[in-house]
Regions:
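Rossmann-fold NAD(P)-binding glycine/threonine-rich loop
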Residues: 1-32
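Short, surface-exposed basic-aromatic patches at helix termini and helix-loop junctions that form
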Residues: 8, 27-37, 53-59
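Long, compositionally biased stretches enriched for glycine and/or charged residues
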Residues: 53-183
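Acidic, His- and aromatic-enriched active-site or binding-groove loops in soluble protein domains
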Residues: 35-51
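Flexible loop/turn segments at secondary-structure boundaries
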Residues: 23-26, 47, 75
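A structural signal for short, well-ordered beta-strand segments and their strand-loop junctions
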Residues: 15-19, 39-41, 68
């Protein structure tokens, strides 16, 4: 419905879709509406920050410079330098290998990519496990445990989001007020 409103009110706009299911929604908009649409993944914007935090390198966050390239949902962090121009990848590779060897965590698939491909992928380990046939295999269910892949992550997240929306709806209906904090 909002696409039809946009066709009427702002037909020359460019719609930037950051919502999931991103590919399906973007494809629908491109096929069945006249609105120019691009689908984008939010993972690119937080990729290097989350990587440095996961590896205990928070002191490198400020002033960092990065180069990311690739297609949507499969971008790669090709370069990451600190504020002084030092390449952070040698230390990232060392810490990622150590972390994967010594503890279970939520980024094991992407750290395995670093081990074999040399670079960090922008998309989550859960999505990478879905996209790449090496991690979720019916003949090797132990891979799911080995790489700590939460097969129920997205359904669980949806359940929590729906609960949040229901609470928000109840709050709005109760007092008629909507609050918003600038992010």
């Amino acid at each position: 419905e909002f696409a039809r409103d946009m066709e009427e009110v702002c037909p020359n706009t460019l719609f930037l879709n950051y919502t999931n299911p991103m590919a399906m929604l973007t494809g629908y908009m491109q096929r069945y509406t006249k609105i120019r649409t691009v689908g984008l993944c939010h993972s690119v914007q937080v990729c290097s920050e989350k990587l440095l935090e996961k590896l205990g390198m928070e002191d490198k966050l400020e002033g960092r410079r990065e180069l990311i390239a690739g297609i949507n949902h499969m971008g790669w962090l090709l370069e990451l330098h600190d504020k002084d121009g030092n390449d952070l990848y040698p230390e990232i590779r060392r810490r990622a290998a150590e972390k994967n060897a010594t503890e279970k965590h939520d980024d094991m698939v992407r750290f395995e990519y670093i081990k074999h491909l040399g670079y960090y992928c922008t998309e989550s380990s859960e999505h990478n496990a879905e996209y790449n046939p090496l991690f979720i295999k019916s003949r090797y269910p132990e891979m799911i445990e080995k790489y700590n892949i939460p097969l129920d992550e997205y359904p669980r997240r949806c359940v929590e989001q729906i609960k949040g929306w229901e609470k928000e709806r109840e709050d709005i209906l109760k007092d008629g007020k909507v609050t918003h904090e600038r992010s």
